[in-house]
């Protein structure tokens, strides 16, 4: 038995709609479509633009206004041209301008002069990256829609192609918690919550953040270590977890990048699953990274991977808007009431945790070796009383006052010891010693010298006698590596040469004028990271 449908209500009188705006060119009138105040894209734009303003005014972002405009205007011009070609109408390029603004917010070009907001340095790099990001929306498509978030795929490709010496992502850590940072957190969080709630994507964002926090907690607890430009010491443990999980850059990623309505599943269950999987994939990609550049690119790459496999995910989750597409019902179906399901869930969780720990092996214990056991068995061969008093640059004192109040003496003693330990590594043909005192370029250089010695080559030692030392702050060029102390030293270098049998075959002596770069390791150790020519003058 069926019920007859109710009688149709009388039709409401037609409401006259205003005629669309037009622009007449060459005698032809073309429709003009401007944005609506209700358009969520305008709300996202207001948040991103506000962050740009805060970055210029109070947060010291290393990006200039011309660079930002180059990215936004390039995308806008391309989008207007493409849509006009398709529809013979002028459409406000809201999405395109978001793509350009997002690229400019996250990308930094190495060499951009700080504190010069109107610098035109490398503006064309922003234009090219933003333009290619936008074009990806029209080139890489599946079932009538773009596959990747345009700014996300463009940034990942740019960082991988250009490399850390030319381009780098915005730092995880922006500034100390001051009024500017509080304003940035307020704008990003409030705007993000309102927009994602309106788009019904809050569940996706929450699923990502909770899963990401848990997965990153496993990685941090395993002893993961990351070097970063804004920290002298390696970022490990709770500091590593806290900085990244609460990073405003991660909040921008979860509120305004992974929640792109066009690139996420349309169903409720699918969206939550998508957020969980982006968090897991991003953490697995971040795990082996030892510096901030690789960590940030890995985070962004997690979304690229999941967008690429989204068609497969769509097949595994309930049909959107079907009776099964209910998150509570789906969770009940996956309930752990039976021992078999509970055991399977436990195995999955253990496998994921083990995978994260295993993937993080390259960033654990190898970057900064535990040196106490190794160095405790070797002669230091350094008399601190023979070292000169150290003059300290104001940049060092401003960054770490403890170094200006006596801590620099210990740094210089450690440098002198490390240089002698390098000699011991060559004499003893022991690479473990190098891991305890060197890192980065210096480690690679000394390992190459050690390989030559182990192959039967002569042993060349260098003993340094310091006459003067000046400490300054070395800002890494490009790669988001840690700050280093530059010890500009002058004095006399005595060189010794030994043959494969251990007999000394020669000795030289002469002045040196070099800058020794050192970086703080875990604990109170400092590592040699480079030897540079002294600055001119």
Indicate where each model-derived feature is located.
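N-terminal signal-anchor module of multipass membrane proteins
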Residues: 2-85, 423
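Structural signature of hydrophobic alpha-helical transmembrane segments
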Residues: 59-74, 112-128, 169-184, 236-250
């Amino acid at each position: 038995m069926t019920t007859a449908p109710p009688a149709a209500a009388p039709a409401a009188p037609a409401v006259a709609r205003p005629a669309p705006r037009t622009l007449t060119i060459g005698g032809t009138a073309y429709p003009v479509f401007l944005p609506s105040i209700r358009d969520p894209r305008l709300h996202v734009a207001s948040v991103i633009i506000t962050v740009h303003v805060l970055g210029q005014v109070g947060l010291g972002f290393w990006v200039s206004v011309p660079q930002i405009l180059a990215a936004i205007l390039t995308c806008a011009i391309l989008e207007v041209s493409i849509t006009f070609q398709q529809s013979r109408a002028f459409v406000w390029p809201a999405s395109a301008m978001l793509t350009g603004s997002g690229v400019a917010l996250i990308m930094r070009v190495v060499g951009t002069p700080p504190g010069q907001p109107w610098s035109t340095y490398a503006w064309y790099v922003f234009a090219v990256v933003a333009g290619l990001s936008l074009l990806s929306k029209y080139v890489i498509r599946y079932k009538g829609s773009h596959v990747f978030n345009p700014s996300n795929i463009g940034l990942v490709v740019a960082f991988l192609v250009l490399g850390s010496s030319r381009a780098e992502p915005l730092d995880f850590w922006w500034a100390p918690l001051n009024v500017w940072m509080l304003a940035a957190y307020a704008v990003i969080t409030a705007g993000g919550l309102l927009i994602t709630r309106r788009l019904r994507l809050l569940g996706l964002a929450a699923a990502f953040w909770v899963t990401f926090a848990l997965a990153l907690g496993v990685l941090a607890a395993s002893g993961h270590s990351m070097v970063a430009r804004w920290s002298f010491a390696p970022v490990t443990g709770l500091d590593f977890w806290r900085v990244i999980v609460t990073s405003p850059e991660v909040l921008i990623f979860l509120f305004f990048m992974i929640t792109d309505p066009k690139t996420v599943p349309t169903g409720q269950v699918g969206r939550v699953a998508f957020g969980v999987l982006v968090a897991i994939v991003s953490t697995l990609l971040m795990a082996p990274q030892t510096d901030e550049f690789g960590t940030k690119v890995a985070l962004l790459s997690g979304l690229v991977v999941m967008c690429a496999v989204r068609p497969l995910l769509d097949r595994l989750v309930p049909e959107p808007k079907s009776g099964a597409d209910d998150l509570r019902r789906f969770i009940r179906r996956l309930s752990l009431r039976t021992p078999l399901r509970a055991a399977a869930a436990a195995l999955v969780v253990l496998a994921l945790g083990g995978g994260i720990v295993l993937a993080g092996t390259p960033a654990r214990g190898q970057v900064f070796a535990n040196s106490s056991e190794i160095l405790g068995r070797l002669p230091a061969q350094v008399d601190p009383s023979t070292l000169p008093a150290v003059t300290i640059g104001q940049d060092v004192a401003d960054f770490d006052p403890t170094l200006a109040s006596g801590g620099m003496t210990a740094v210089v003693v450690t440098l002198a010891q490390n240089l002698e330990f390098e000699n011991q590594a060559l004499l003893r043909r022991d690479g473990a010693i190098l891991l305890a005192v060197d890192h980065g370029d210096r480690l690679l250089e000394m390992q190459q010298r050690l390989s030559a010695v182990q192959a039967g080559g002569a042993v060349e030692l260098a003993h340094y006698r310091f006459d003067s030392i000046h400490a300054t702050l070395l800002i890494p060029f490009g790669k988001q590596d840690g700050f280093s102390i530059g010890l500009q030293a002058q004095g006399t270098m005595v060189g010794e040469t030994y043959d494969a049998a251990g007999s000394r075959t020669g000795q030289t002596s002469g002045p040196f004028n070099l800058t020794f770069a050192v970086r703080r390791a875990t604990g109170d150790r400092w590592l040699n990271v480079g030897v540079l020519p002294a600055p001119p003058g």
